[in-house]
Structures are given as structure tokens and as C-alpha cells.
Swiss-Prot record:
TM region(s), chain numbering: none
Molecular function GO labels: DNA binding
UniProt keywords, alphabetically: Repressor, Stress response, Transcription, Transcription regulation
Gene: hrcA
Alphabetized Gene3D superfamilies for the sequence: 3.30.450.40, Heat-inducible transcription repressor hrca homolog, domain 3 (3.30.390.60), Winged helix-like DNA-binding domain superfamily/Winged helix DNA-binding domain (1.10.10.10)
Job of this protein: Negative regulator of class I heat shock genes (grpE-dnaK-dnaJ and groELS operons). Prevents heat-shock induction of these operons.
NCBIfam families membership: hrcA
Pfam families: HrcA (PF01628)
Organism domain of life: Bacteria
Family: Belongs to the HrcA family.
Single GO BP term: negative regulation of DNA-templated transcription
Protein name: Heat-inducible transcription repressor HrcA
Amino acid sequence: MAHHDPIHLIAPRAGLAQLNERSRDIFRQIVESYLATGEPVGSRNISRLIAMPLSPASVRNVMADLEQLGLIYAPHTSAGRLPTELGLRFFVDALMQVGDLNDAERQSIQSQLTSVGQAQSVEAALDQALTRLSGLTRAAAVVLTPKSNARLKHIEFVRLEPEKALVILVGEDGQVENRVLTLPPGVPSSAITEAGNFLNSRIRGRTLAEARLELETALGEARAELDQLTQKVISAGIASWSGGENEDRQLIVRGHANLLEDLHALEDLERVRLLFDDLETKRGVIDLLGRAETAEGVRIFIGSENKLFSLSGSSTIISPYRDAAGHIVGVLGVIGPTRLNYARVIPTVDYAARIVSRLLGG
């Protein structure tokens, strides 16, 4: 099989003491049974599944230790056990083998995603890619469309009131963005003019993200040359557009129906309903995915690790994708129940992100 770059997983570590081989084997069987069926598993079934010969009583003793460590719990009055969120995290981090996709699987994903390359727009291509990713993973697939890469041409400050100014950003493509800026008290017009000159000398030809990084560095180096009020106007100007990068970005979600498959109990249905509600809160999802763009690899959030979806007991597996210049411009991934098939979904999301990057010229 051809060599492929390794998958880089970015995930918090469980930080638990090393379990002995017997405990690991029993714990692995509990988790794998849960991922396969969604049902609690008891000591009698575990004793049949594990490689080493152990009586149900011995298995129960180990399960009691695992429960004390917070890795498993007993749901309601069931005699069986399920993994906790901490247990799932420990399994994903320390025990699970993230298999590489075989050539046939890669070819299947590549052929499905490459066919979207004839779409009329980037958004349409991503939409089609998501539909295929959702089908491959049997989960809801999400994508945050690319950031605007428009280059800046000019910035201008127009004073509206003693402590308010209009910031006008003009792009090389003719697009104009306006933001109202709160000025520090007592700022003279000369400081506003100097701030405008400082910014214009450094932003031309840069994207918004590039300009912000350049200005933060340049401002640190030029503090001795600028008076304090001018520095404050420059900092306020940078801040005025720093929160708006995600405002014109689209969140596309496909495959909601997959979340309704294989429900095991009424509480599952309630969790899915809560997840649907979370997905409707698109601003929160956009901000969450936007924050994940700083990562170089696959990120995994299990349950309450992701504050947005913590109430719905969901897992999120996401990976950034890139443009022709190799810059991260968006994020795609899947959202589903905590009993996702992690070993399969993780490499699928990773490979899908690589194919989308290729389609975008990355």
C-alpha cells in the first residue's frame, strides 16, 4: 500500500495511571461492546469475550476498580456497565488503534468527493462533499465555509462623535466594510490621522487575518514612535474587525437523519432532540469550528469537553482544510452520538479534509 502522511490527533489526555493488561482488556471489551451495541455489558459476557480465562466474579472485581477510577458506570439499575466520557477519552487516547484506510476505502472516498469538483461554486462543492461524508460516517456532517481571502487596499477613520468613529475598510476587489469604533476619551484628530497612516502603510495587499498579525507585531515594534492615544486608536481599529471574520461564513450541516438511526432508548431520542437544537444555534457552532482552525490535525471532543454540545451527549470529530497556498481556510467534520465508530470515523474525516483541500487547490 502506498505511504500516506500520518493522522495527527489533537486531543486532551486522560492523565490516568497505567492500567494492567487484564484491566485494559476488560475495559476495552466494555467500550467496544458499547460502541457496537449501545447497551450495557455484564461481567458474564465480558468473561466470555476476553482472551485470558477469568471468572465473572474476577471480572466484577476489575469492573469495580474501573468504576472507582471513573472509567465506567452502572446506568440505572442495570447489572451491566457503560463507559463514562472520561472512559471514552481514555480509550480514544490510549487504547484505540486508529487504523489507516485501505486502498479500496481511499478510492471510494476519493471518487465520491472528486465528483463534486464540477460544482458551480466552492459552497456547492462543500455541500456535496458533506452529503457524501455524512453517508460514509453515518453521522451528521458539518463544514465551515472558507474565510474571505480578499486583499485590503485602504482603511479610513471618519469621526462621528467625540468618542465614536466610523472605520471604513476597502478591499482590492472594491468591497467596502464599515464598523463603528469607540474612541478613547480625549483623542485629538491628529491621533486619528496618524493611526490611519500607520495602518495604511501596513495593510495594503494583505488579507484581514494577515493584516491583523502584521499590525500586532508592527505596533509592538513602533511603540516608542507613537504617542499613547495613537496607539489606543490603532489597537481599537484592529479590534473592531477582529471579531468579524466569521460573520459572512456559512455553516452547512447534512445528514441530520443519521442521528435518528439506531436509537436505543427514549433518553437517546431526547439527546438527539437537544443536538438538533444545538445545531440550529449556528452562531455557536460557527464560533466553535472557527476556534478549531488553529489546529494542524484532527480534533476530537467527547461529550462535555465540547461546551456547545455537552447537554446532548455528543462527540465531534473535525479537521481543517486548506487553500491553494496551503493556508487553513475552513473546518469540516462530523457530529454524532458519543458511541461513534472512532477508529473508522477519524481516518475518514482526516482523508476527506485532504481531498477537499486538493479540490480547492491546496
